[in-house]
Amino acid sequence: MDFVRKYFFVSIALGCTAIFLMLISCSKKSADPDTVITPAKTTTPPVTTTPVMVTLAGNGVNLQLSYYSGGNADLGFTLMKQQSKIKTVRIEIEPNQVNNAIRWIKEASDNGYTIICTYHKAAVLGSDQLQDLLDGANWWKTNYAALSASGKFYINLMNEWGSHSLSAANYAGYYNQAIAIVRTVYKGIIIIDIPGYGQETYVATNAVLGVSTGGVKITDTDIALSTHIYPGNYVGQHVNATGSFASGGNMVKADLDYLATSGRTCLVGEFGNGTNGTADWSGLVDYAKSKSWTILGWSWAGDGGDNIHPPMNMISPNFQAYKAGSIYPYTTSSYFEVVYNKL
């Protein structure tokens, strides 16, 4: 801002000159409404492809409890507390497990962990159907109050909704509807899994930016985008912000770079080594970590294996029945270091 300085030279011999200077000085400060005053220049920041990324939470692990002992399982927190790198737990909840999940969340909260809870319906993984996503949103609307009474957590709206062929326009439009429902009960960051089982980084990014969507984009800005990383990761859609198109292939670091251009917090909601495929899952996880993204290993326990690869469980045996007042003596498994060394 410029400041007008007035200099007054009082002299009888130069009286006329002094009056002249005073008149000029007053005219520069005039508050006359007809005077055009140029305000301080404000500019809209340009869209950037290198946004400042925010770390959502500390690194940690996934727990899939719904399928063991009817969900009434011992979570193994006594052993977990001995693993100092584990700061966050992501808990997958099948729709019928609300009562058990209340205890899961309370135990995680009592043990001091940051908690992410995700609606997980195994029967519709990879679905492109709007109704499946809305079912998840309405489940949160119905159950958030009861669940959150046991402890604070981030909502991961739905686990792995959306196939590899889902369009960015539908991903954006459908999530706008689902997010609006969740917002009636929850005001925090909503984590949304990117489509293609957590692999289609371009689709999710374009849905946020409104690229190749006919103008549709995800309107809620308080969201985080979650990718899942395994050897089988495949990115089939590569339409970027300039309209360039590339063929599909294994997920590579550039795919994570493009996800970062969304301008939203990003995280690795799951990672592990136990699937078919040749993607460099280890290098990708390390790269995401170098970007300060939260990384969450699959899994503490609850993985059932696929009859080809051994279960990706960090503890042994798999989840056992919960007994009040009793602690099951889990031990770490041979898989433990695969995840833990990355955290």
Question: Where would I find each of the regions flagged by the language model?
Answer:
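Bacterial Sec-dependent N-terminal signal peptides
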Residues: I19-T50
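Extracellular glycoside hydrolase catalytic/binding regions
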Residues: G58-L65, G70, T78, L134, ...
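An active-site-proximal structural segment forming one wall of the substrate-binding cleft
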Residues: N72-I86, I93-H120, L125-L157, A169-R183
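The conserved SAM/SAH-binding core of class I Rossmann-like methyltransferase domains
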Residues: I91, C117-T118, G269, W298
